[in-house]
Each structure stands twice: as structure tokens, then as C-alpha cells.
Amino acid sequence: MPSMFYRFVVLVLALTAWSFADTKKPASKPAGGAPDKAHLQKIWDGWGTLDPSNVAEYYATGPHTFFDIAPLKYASWDEYKAGVVKELADYKAAKFTVNDDAEIHPAGQYAWVTATVKEDMTQKSGKREMGNFRWTAVFEKQNGRWVIVHEHVSAPMQ
């Protein structure tokens, strides 16, 4: 009987050691990936050119709602692009930086992100505007690319 007990103890110890040795870290990204902070920064680098055509590839076409600081809303990328050109017409330079508080929440073929974005903009008159604003975006994977299907940009009331 002692040899049976000895075998049992050895078996339990071996299984325990094997279970600890076979631990693997879970993948840091879900299958299919999600936009990452570098991707988010590319979008804002495009906006820094003050030319919406430089960010068009990041936005879905069709009837989607985009909320920017002004006006109240846009119902499609075409409306957004046309409206933003007017809003940016008074500026000669801009730089946007996605802050370290960016959060990316993957959910299958969708992902939603939140971040604050640092702005440094110079008007054609020379007046400089600096601050931070809030950004929330919903991405959808379309044809292998992550595109924004809903966006909200806002500044805190002062």
C-alpha cells in the first residue's frame, strides 16, 4: 500500500508542476486586432494638416453621425468634410496629440475609443489656441480596415 500512495503523490506533484509550466500569457489583442494608439495618432496627424482629404480614409462613407465642436452635428462624411473646411479656414497651422489617457475597447468587428487630445492651433491672424478636448469614436472593421462610423469631439464648458 505505501508504494501505491507514493505513486499517487508523485503523480499529483508531476501534474501540478506540468500545469504551472504550461502557462501562457493571453494574447494582448483580440483576434482581428483593433485600432491602436499609433492608429489614433495617425488620424489626428491627418487633421493637423487642416485638410479633411488627408483623413477621409479613416472615415466611413454613407449615413453616419459625427458630432464636432461646431456645428451641432453632421449626418455623413460628405457633410463633415464640407463643414470642417469652413471651420478650419481661419487657421494656418495645427498640431494634435492623443494623450496617454486613450482607451481602446475592442468588441468584435467594432471598437470604441475615448481620449483627450491636446491641441495647438494657430489662426491666420497669428493668435495661438492651446488646450485639450474630448474625443470618442466608434470604429467598424470594413473591408479589412478600421474606419470611424461615429465620432464625438467636444470641449468642456468654461
Regions found by a protein language model. Name each.
Residues 7-17:
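Bacterial N-terminal signal peptides
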Residues 108-119:
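A short hydrophobic beta-strand element
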